[in-house]
Amino acid sequence: MGKIPIKRILAIDYGKKRTGLAKTDPFCSFAQPVGTFPPEKIITIIKSFLQENSVEKIIVGYPLNSDGTKNPMTGIIDGFIEELSAAFPDIPVEPIDEHGSSKQAGKVLIESGLSRKKRQRKGRLDSAAACLLLQHYLENTGNA
């Protein structure tokens, strides 16, 4: 009997300085951090990730203002989504509203009991934000 391929969802919290990645567990039930990486290396990092993991979808945090309008970062993300779609044409890329995800991730890190010094490592915040984006996505699509 053949092995059933396990497909994951990959979430990206793209930033100018750091980009957080998160993935689902093998059953697409909950989010797990992958790490934080320099944005200029993220396509290479994802290619490496895909060599070891089957991904059915990539979701990207999409920065909108609280009133739903676009902001300067939205254009950067639009370009990044085009780059992702070109690099991985067989994997759908879906933008999802990320409004407040970094702020919420900061609160989660505080509640987790991490010391202020450890919380201030920005990489933790970016990967936590990617996890929150993904968990929110899973809950809203009925996967969690």
Curated annotation (Swiss-Prot):
EC number(s) recorded for this UniProt protein: 3.1.-.-
GO molecular function: nuclease activity
Chief localization: cytoplasm
InterPro entries: RNaseH-like_sf, YqgF, YqgF/RNaseH-like_dom, YqgF/RNaseH-like_dom_sf
Assigned keywords, A-Z: Cytoplasm, Hydrolase, Nuclease, Ribosome biogenesis
Gene Ontology CC terms, in alphabetical order: cytosol
Subcellular location: Cytoplasm
Biological-process GO terms, alphabetical: rRNA 5'-end processing
One Pfam family recorded for the sequence: RuvX
SUPFAM superfamilies hit by this protein: Ribonuclease H-like
NCBIfam families assigned to the protein according to its UniProt record, in alphabetical order: RNAse_H_YqgF
Stated family: Belongs to the YqgF nuclease family.
Known function: Could be a nuclease involved in processing of the 5'-end of pre-16S rRNA.
Record protein name field: Putative pre-16S rRNA nuclease
Organism per entry: Chlorobium phaeobacteroides (strain BS1)
